[in-house]
A protein has these predicted regions:
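RNase III-family endoribonuclease catalytic core
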Residues: 2-113
Length: 113
């Protein structure tokens, strides 16, 4: 990957999440909010919305599979409620904050507040 003048250390982020990307540009896109690109027109990479869409679906599938196997006697309604409690904006935001992931996000000055 060519060196870019960005304010986030992608190598350090890979260490935090314990995943090494074959294509570091995917990670760069994953941490880039659309608002950042609006303020940095020179940026030549994508924002994270499409990856967010895919990630949400993958996360829901993984959690669903886990709950389905872990609780074979629970009815669908209970499993859905547990999944909803685990996979929601508040719980995911809290987890991201605990991991320090917010420090790696590229957002506009207005969004960062």
């Amino acid at each position: 990957m060519e060196e870019r003048d960005i304010s986030v250390d992608l190598r350090a982020l890979q260490d935090v999440i314990k995943v090494n990307f074959n294509d570091i540009n995917q990670l760069l896109s994953a941490v880039t909010h659309r608002s950042y690109l609006n303020e940095h027109r020179e940026a030549d990479w994508d924002h994270n919305e499409r990856l967010e869409f895919l990630g949400d679906a993958v996360l829901e599938l993984i959690v669903t599979d886990y709950l389905f196997k872990k609780y074979p006697d629970k009815p669908e309604g209970e499993l859905t409620a547990v999944r909803a409690a685990l996979v929601n904006t508040v719980s995911l935001s809290e987890t991201a904050e605990k991991l320090g992931l917010n420090d790696y996000l590229l957002m506009s000055k207005g969004e960062a507040k």
